[in-house]
UniProtKB/Swiss-Prot annotation:
Designated gene of the protein: acnB
Keyword Oxidoreductase belongs to the record: no
A Gene Ontology BP annotation from the UniProt entry: tricarboxylic acid cycle
EC code: 4.2.1.3, 4.2.1.99
Residues that bind substrate: R192, S235, S236, R237, Q404, D405, T406, S488, R780, R785
UniProt name for this protein: Aconitate hydratase B
Source organism: Synechocystis sp. (strain ATCC 27184 / PCC 6803 / Kazusa)
Annotated pathway: Carbohydrate metabolism; tricarboxylic acid cycle; isocitrate from oxaloacetate: step 2/2; Organic acid metabolism; propanoate degradation
Protein family (similarity comment): Belongs to the aconitase/IPM isomerase family.
Keyword annotations: 4Fe-4S, Iron, Iron-sulfur, Lyase, Metal-binding, RNA-binding, Tricarboxylic acid cycle
Entry cofactors: [4Fe-4S] cluster
Function comment: Involved in the catabolism of short chain fatty acids (SCFA) via the tricarboxylic acid (TCA)(acetyl degradation route) and probably via the 2-methylcitrate cycle I (propionate degradation route). Catalyzes the reversible isomerization of citrate to isocitrate via cis-aconitate. Catalyzes the hydration of 2-methyl-cis-aconitate to yield (2R,3S)-2-methylisocitrate. The apo form of AcnB functions as a RNA-binding regulatory protein.
Matches recorded under PANTHER family: ACONITATE HYDRATASE B (PTHR43160:SF4)
Subunit note: Monomer.
Length: 868
């Protein structure tokens, strides 16, 4: 084992990174070696056990905890580890598999062992239900009483150093906008769980010399601060923060290959990225960065809210947010603070003590007495109150949580660190949409291992080839509830969601709640009627277009203006949209850098969708999807809502940070996002004639109607000019399109059809040719996302099909002539959606579970369907 491990160490040293953490098999062999260690290897073996085994409920942690417990109990001897030393090492394992052992050791007759166990447990936060065991034991056991007293005092927090009054750093600046694809490039998605290896790809396209510059700046002797005009836009991937912190953060004791801390300064910091930085123990600061340049040595005064240069002159000021941020940094991150503070509060409550004054508590904003917006009511309901005012720190219940395959392995690792063995969120979904089409060996292993990891914790796991996370997760939503997901496009069309990085998603799934600083809302009101040839995707692009006309959004990154940044977009005026259509609007709020979104729909629309989804989930159970109990519970709650349908509405006197009216009567032609920025929206007529080499019709922004319409445009027109990619969002869409003969039309057009999933959208597997111009229905058009040097337009499927037909962006006249002839007369037939309850015998399609072996809702819930 040691020889193989040393070879691995040498291979990694060539890359300048540490070895991988030990797995369970290696840890088992290590523990055997430690029973009779070779003299020359004693120090190395101890280092491996202490520092290179993952904590929490990792399989290797299970082996380590068992070995150390056996030493502490005298069942195994190790010449290098005393009984007390074993207990001390158990105390470094954060929580999970070490907790029950430490509780048992509180009862040891060896007072040194019992005392060491008390010390170890006093700084262990991830105890969850074991809290009750320690509390009960404290009535009769003095060492358990020590633990309870330490938790009540907040000793875990007191023993951590405060954030200094002044922090001197060296600036590393990336001018303009840095998105998460720059920091965590999609083609390297498979390496994300391996933080040091993945971090080698940071800025490889944006600033290839960047990592060398950071290494040089570190020689000045100060920490390096990451600085940018706009930082962290785009995907929610926690790997972006992981990579940044790997280069500018500090090692976390006893947690291999992960770093915390660090300083991030941005003119604008995207909300998900900001939150993920908080969770990871970094100090993110929004401030004017115009006077900051690479190599500058500056001093940050966090409590005074100013930054000075080497001469002591103030060059910029800031206001820390949230008000608890310094506590978060001191605790090692927002998540450790929340867990630790909750443990201290819970302990003090059990002892009849008042809340601890040790922590900065969020200040509730003044109640204006005004009404609440729809979003504020939804979050209020999840917090057990009528509504939540902007600026309120709260922890809403997470009814639905989503995870996909390029973030799922990181979420799994975070869940292990959180010592999670079962989900408290009502439904947690894991999908395989980003890697199913062209899996690498590591992806195939993920496809094999991750479903069981999630389903054994009460989650639901989809299968490779099923399709896109959002197209499925939306079908599992309950109206007026709150959720999250490890993908920035987790933008519920029913209820509201706040997408997050993997750490916060793991927290939400494990604990069933999520911390939220309630954002302000911007109301987008649609008026007028959709004009001929104008699609819903054009209305998606009309939102930033109107905002730009009003000076509320700019494309330039220096002094960027974005009225939507960090706010909730609340949309109304299109109540009769189908839910699939509504998702086009909510989905695209990710590109506006919104923290979340809502859309007001009619009860009839929502009821139609839920009736369909009940049948889909029953079919999933028939097909053997797990966890069936979770699916049954969600079916029961949907049927309960259908029995008594009711939807929340915003109050007429609710207050918004801004109101933007989009008059559909004024949108006379398609609007596209031009290369290479989703905010760079233009009228189609401004781009007419631009040559298009490749066309992609796919992504979560599409539904079955788009493919029918595209096929109608292509039908009988021969082979398209250039390359056409077709990728439906789910296997159900694909099956229906095949049955309707649509795939035959795509074949005749020379299209390349892809397995249902994300395909080109993220650019982590299939990619377009270098340097081509693309028209795409996908979500984003960041530089190099779909292909190296690719220039990408974003717009509707209908316009995409016309571009494929003509090999260029059409004039308004060309476009309207085609769609008025080929689409408009058939709209009722083309834009039909998948209502599974209207498909004969759909519930039994692909059945592998016999009817008499199907679990029953009454058995799962212990109550009849629809019971209160």
């Amino acid at each position: 084992m040691l020889q193989a491990y040393r070879r691995h160490v040498a291979d990694r040293q060539k890359l300048g990174i540490p070895p991988l953490p030990l797995n369970a098999q290696q840890t088992t062999e290590l523990c055997e070696l430690l029973k009779n260690p070779p003299e020359a290897e004693k120090e190395e073996l101890m280092m491996l056990l202490r520092d290179r085994v993952p904590p929490g409920v990792d399989e290797a942690a299970y082996v380590k905890a068992g070995f150390l417990t056996a030493i502490a109990k005298g069942e195994v001897t190790c010449p290098l580890i005393s009984g007390q030393g074993a207990v001390d090492l158990l105390g470094t394992m954060i929580g999970g598999y070490n907790v029950q052992s430490l509780i048992e050791l509180l009862k040891s007759k060896d007072t040194n062992i019992a005392s060491a166990a008390a010390t170890a447990l006093s700084k262990t936060l991830l105890v969850f239900d074991a809290f009750n065991d320690v509390l009960h034991l404290s009535d009769t056991n003095g060492y358990a009483k020590q633990v309870i007293d330490a938790w009540a005092e907040g000793a875990w927090f007191i023993n951590k150093p405060e954030v200094p009054e002044r922090i001197t750093v060296t600036v590393f600046k990336v001018p303009g906008e840095t998105n998460t694809d720059d920091l965590s490039p999609a083609p390297h998605a498979t390496t994300r769980p391996d933080i040091p290896l993945h971090a080698l790809a940071m800025l490889e396209a944006k600033m290839p010399e960047g990592l060398g510059t950071i290494a040089e700046l570190k020689q000045k002797g100060h920490p390096v601060a990451y600085v940018g005009d706009v930082v962290g836009t785009g995907s929610s991937r926690k790997s972006a923060i992981n990579s940044v912190l790997w280069h500018i953060g500090t090692d976390i004791p006893f947690v291999p290959n992960k770093r915390a801390g660090g300083y991030i300064l941005g003119g604008k910091i995207a909300p998900i990225f900001f939150n993920t930085a908080e969770d990871s123990g970094a100090l993110p600061i929004e401030c004017d960065v115009n006077q900051l340049n690479t190599g500058d040595v500056i001093t940050i005064y966090p409590r005074e809210g100013k930054i000075t240069n080497k001469a002591g002159e103030t060059i910029t000021t800031f206001q820390l947010k949230p008000e608890t941020i310094l506590d978060e940094v001191r605790a090692g991150g927002r998540i450790p603070l929340l867990i630790g503070r909750a443990l201290t509060d819970k302990t003090r409550e059990a002892l009849g003590l008042s809340p601890s004054p040790l922590f900065v508590r969020p200040t509730a904003p003044a109640d204006t007495g005004k009404g609440f917006t729809l979003a504020q009511k939804m979050v209020g309901k999840a917090c057990g109150v009528q509504g939540i005012r902007p600026g309120t720190s709260c922890e809403p219940i997470m009814t639905t949580v989503g995870s996909q395959d390029t973030t799922g392995p990181m979420t799994r690792d975070e869940l292990k660190e959180l010592a999670c063995l079962g989900f408290n969120a009502d439904l947690t979904l894991q999908t395989f949409c980003h890697t199913a089409a062209y899996p690498k060996p590591v992806d195939i292993k993920t496809h094999k291992d991750l479903p069981d990891f999630f389903s054994t914790r009460g989650g639901v796991a989809l299968r490779p080839g099923d399709g896109i996370i959002h197209s499925w997760l939306n079908r599992m939503l309950l109206p007026d509830t709150v959720g999250t997901g490890g993908d920035s496009h987790t933008r519920f069309p029913l209820g509201i969601s706040f997408p997050a990085g993997s750490g916060l998603v793991a927290f939400a799934a494990a604990l069933g709640v999520m911390p939220l600083d309630m954002p302000e809302s911007v109301l987008v009101k649609f008026t007028g009627e959709l004009q001929p040839g104008v699609t819903l995707r054009d209305i998606v692009n009309a939102i930033p277009w109107v905002a730009m006309q009003q000076g509320k959004l700019t494309v330039g990154k220096g002094d960027k203006v974005n009225v939507f940044n960090g706010r909730i977009m609340e949309m109304e005026g299109l109540p009769d949209l189908k839910v699939e259509q509504a998702f086009e609007l909510t989905d695209a709020t990710a590109e506006r850098s919104c923290s979340g979104s809502t859309i007001k729909l009619s009860e009839e629309t929502v009821a139609e969708y839920l009736r369909s989804n009940v049948v889909l989930m029953k079919n999933m159970i028939a097909r053997g999807y797990q966890d069936a109990r979770t699916l049954l519970r969600r079916i029961a709650k949907m049927e309960e809502w259908l029995a008594n349908p009711s939807l929340m509405s915003g109050d007429a006197d609710a207050e918004y940070a801004d109101v933007i009216e989009v008059n559909l009567d004024e949108i006379k032609e398609p609007i596209v996002a031009a290369p290479n920025d989703p905010d760079n929206v233009k009228l189609m007529s401004e781009c007419a004639g631009d040559v298009i080499h490749e066309v992609f019709i796919g992504s979560c922004m599409t539904n079955i109607g788009h493919y029918r319409a595209a096929a109608k445009i292509l039908e009988g027109a021969g082979t398209v000019k250039g390359r056409l990619w077709i990728c439906p969002p789910t296997r159900m869409d694909e099956q229906q399109l095949r049955e309707e003969g649509i795939y035959g039309i795509f074949a005749a057009a020379g299209a390349r059809t892809e397995m249902p999933g994300c395909s080109l959208c993220m650019g982590n597997q299939a990619r377009v040719e270098d340097g081509v111009t693309v028209f795409s229905t996908s979500t984003r058009n960041f530089n190099n996302r779909m292909g190296k040097g690719a220039q990408v337009y974003l717009g509707s499927a209908e316009l995409a099909a016309v571009c494929a037909l003509l090999g260029k962006i059409p004039t308004v006249e060309e476009y309207l002539a085609i769609v008025s002839e080929k689409v408009a007369p058939f709209e009722g037939e083309l834009y039909r959606y998948l209502n599974f309850n209207e498909i004969d015998n759909f519930e039994d399609f692909g059945r592998v579970i016999p009817l008499d072996q199907m679990p029953k809702i009454e058995d799962i819930l212990g109550m009849p369907v629809g019971a209160k």
